[in-house]
Amino acid sequence: MLTIGTALRPGATRVMLLGAGELGKEVAIECQRLGLEVIAVDRYADAPAMHVAHRSHVINMLDGAALKQLVAQEKPHYIVPEIEAIATDMLVELEKMGQHVVPCAEATRLTMNREGIRRLAAETLQLPTSSYRFADTDSAFFQAVRDIGYPCIVKPVMSSSGKGQSLIRSEEHLQAAWEYAQQGGRAGSGRVIIEGLVHFDFEITLLTIRAVDGIHFCAPIGHRQEDGDYRESWQPQAMSDIALQRAKEISAQVVTALGGFGLFGVELFVCGDDVIFSEVSPRPHDTGMVTLISQNMSEFALHVRAFLGLPIGTIRQYGAAASAVILPELTSQNITYRGLETALIGDTQIRLFGKPEIAGQRRLGVALAVADNIETAIEVAKKAAGNIEVSGE
């Protein structure tokens, strides 16, 4: 039976978040609701989750020694990775020393880069995926593209939010695509994956929870991508019963192979009744922010319940709902927001992440809406997001 100690007291139950962005912030809030002591860690100061944590630290999370020292200092009961760019080999070592890594260290190691999870899905589990090759030199990259054929997609094996990702339609784009991929990796330049283009009707995120009371699924989430990053997401995404069943079967296989308790964001391509595995993250997913308004328990609440070893019970979905990102472009270290009075009309909500600065384009918030149908929910969310005016000195 779980015992939770009181935060800031000797018997506190401590949760260390490795990654303190907007997703980590919502996880921190859910931890706070249960009286857990929250320690937020990121590579920069004043990250969103740090605003709602009991303590925070700024370290290079790719530095295994620094990570080990911080864990020894804070003595967390749960280590919760919220990003890919972490010294996962150190997480494996820490787990062997008795630390509880969420969902487990092997899951974070395999999913920190696209190669580990692709080989697990395609080669070990024999799941349907796109054709693919890996390369770590320009010559190997050029050959891999020739093997896959045009059009194809190149991505750093370790990146997020579309960084370093590009669509290659002809040979003239090869050099630029290689150089862009080398700039976009979370751990610097290095290995890339080249994927054949999959013809699909739509993409979904199937939030899949592995918990003490079994495997649970949220309703499928549809989303629109632009420049490799999501712009709107909605729930539920309409799909055939056969496709949904196949999606659940694939997702269950993947999360069972990864192991541990927690929420996983499984990305899938759907074409008619056929489902193709794309990627998985062993943590809440950005497209899943729609669950802040669409369900009785958000993806963040579900993640916390699962990793604490608590039962999930019943997940209720309230009907057509959507999220739309607030994505301004400016340079400022003193960001201000206006227009909330206009944005908050009808069944809408706004989340402003509290990021300390912006240099170029950056996701600073999200608008959420519920409506009678998906199309209306998306339009209402987009309109609400567009009504937020962002400025800075």
Swiss-Prot record:
Known catalytic reactions: N(1)-(5-phospho-beta-D-ribosyl)glycinamide + formate + ATP = N(2)-formyl-N(1)-(5-phospho-beta-D-ribosyl)glycinamide + ADP + phosphate + H(+)
Residues reported to bind N(1)-(5-phospho-beta-D-ribosyl)glycinamide: 22-23, 82, 286, 355, 362-363
Gene3D superfamilies: 3.40.50.20, ATP-grasp fold, A domain, ATP-grasp fold, B domain
UniProt keyword annotations, A-Z: ATP-binding, Ligase, Magnesium, Metal-binding, Nucleotide-binding, Purine biosynthesis
UniProt GO MF annotations: ATP binding; magnesium ion binding; phosphoribosylglycinamide formyltransferase 2 activity; phosphoribosylglycinamide formyltransferase activity
A GO-annotated cellular component: cytosol
Signal peptide: none
Pfam families membership: ATP-grasp, PurT_C, RS_preATP-grasp-like
Subunit relationships: Homodimer.
HAMAP family: PurT (MF_01643)
Designated name of the protein: Formate-dependent phosphoribosylglycinamide formyltransferase
Originating organism: Yersinia pseudotuberculosis serotype IB (strain PB1/+)
Recorded name of the encoding gene: purT
